[in-house]
Amino acid sequence: MSDPRYQIDVSVVTRYLKEQSDPENSRFAFAYTITVQNNGSLSAKLLSRHWLITNGDGEVEEVRGAGVVGQQPNIDPGQSHTYSSGAVISTRVGTMQGSYQMFAEDGKRFDAEIAPFRLAVPGALH
């Protein structure tokens, strides 16, 4: 969305969870920490999430749900909300992308896009 009142920026850091993975059974676990930064001029509440999780074979899992990790945080201008969660895929490499549905203090609903980010076992990519 180009309206500067509704500017939400999303940053992601991922980590492979070797101890929770089982490569022999095609189970690769990853943690991710996401920071949702409100760079707009209005407070906005994170209502829901929509994820597309794609494994290295191109198989896509779609996930929708209310809030993030049981919360629907209200994020004031200049403030951020950080949370951690995880995903399990069946290949050594995959991607996640999606959006958050936000509700601004002026009553407008808008989507905050989450750009694609990579899930990868260390050494899986050259």
Curated annotation (Swiss-Prot):
Residues 2-126 form the ApaG domain. It comes from the Bacteria. One of its GO terms (biological process) is error-free translesion synthesis. Pfam families: DUF525. InterPro entries: ApaG_domain, ApaG_sf, Uncharacterised_ApaG. HAMAP family: ApaG. This is Protein ApaG. It comes from Pseudomonas putida (strain ATCC 47054 / DSM 6125 / CFBP 8728 / NCIMB 11950 / KT2440).
